[in-house]
Amino acid sequence: MAVSLPWDAGPPLTHTLTSTVEMPLIPDQPPQFELVPTSRSRNRVRVVCLGGGTGLSMILRGVKRISNVTAVVTTTDDGGSSGRLRRDFGMPAPGDVRHCLSALAEDESLVNQLFEHRFTDGELAGHSFGNLFLAGLTDLLGSFDQAVSESARVLAVVGRVVPSTTDMVELVAEMEDGRTVRGETAIAADGSSIRTVRLDPPDPAAHPRALQAIERADLIVMGPGSLFTSTLPPLLVPGIREAVRAAKVPRIYVCNLLQQPGETEGYRASDHIGRIYEHVGDDLVDAVLVSRNRAEHGVPVPVDRGGLRRQGVRVFGARLAGEWQHDADKLGRTLVRLSRWNRDELQ
């Protein structure tokens, strides 16, 4: 299916997008991007993905072989193995970082499988080998940052995994009923509507390599994943949100396929953007990428183009849904093609 554009984009990259991305763009919205042939369209683009959880690791598998990717990862997980290691060793949560390292591993080797192996018996029950490996290296080297770098070397990682911060931070939620819930795990398990989330302490230092990657990116991707406990935490780190806001490249929010019980029940696509803006200010998202087909299970997130238009956000669509989540390969190819849109001007 040919791409429909509300302005003349020229033939070269229009052809590249044909039959892969269907874009129901808003015709009365001034263009924020222009399609222009650049030298990087023939090379591997630099993609920065922010978030955590299974959503981030899925997207990394989709882009790792067709881009130079950097994952900027949340470190607020305090449950299970990650939580125990945080408390015992005073280190940032390793779980989301471990998932990203495994997702970016060169191949699914035995070492990679070992990294994801979770013990089921004895005193190690619940721990994954990868978390213990990261904890051991952190203890040996005296640096979680160095532990991540050495783990990436062992796994022959394609791309880079960078913690959003290596400071010890806790996620805190203010619920709609007025209660305060502390800790990512407790927030996710509470089941009540979330009003806001914040970091404690509120001013952790952003990782310098995260800021550098954002500054050099050709495309910045937020989501998919749990809005309050995966997508927002990296953006709450001072310095990161400012770097994303200052970026002169497309900033894409990949909308979740499904509403998430306890976090985003009843949310439309514009509600996701609205909550991001309430937490970190507006002008942080240029476009929302949605799936034009539905997952086979779960309650889909309605795409309200009118609400997104009022927020100044464009809508891009492609057939991206698998059974439960996005098809990683389709999503990766679509995002790399969208990186060829250059922002026309800062709003």
Predicted regions and their residues:
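Glycine/threonine-rich flexible loop motifs
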Residues: 227-237, 298-302
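Gly/lys/ser-thr-rich phosphate-binding loops in alpha/beta enzymes
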Residues: 32-91, 95
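Charged helix-capping and loop-helix junction motifs
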Residues: 234-241, 267-273
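An anion/phosphate-binding loop that grips the pyrophosphate of nucleotide cofactors and donors
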Residues: 217
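Active-site glycine-rich loop that binds ribose-phosphate moieties when present
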Residues: 196-213, 236, 271
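Electropositive, gly/pro-rich neighborhoods at or near active sites that engage anionic ligands
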Residues: 2-21, 74-192, 198, 336-340
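C-terminal functional extensions of proteins
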Residues: 2-31, 266-347
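Short, conserved loop/helix-junction motifs that constitute active-site signature segments
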Residues: 63-68, 242-248, 277-285
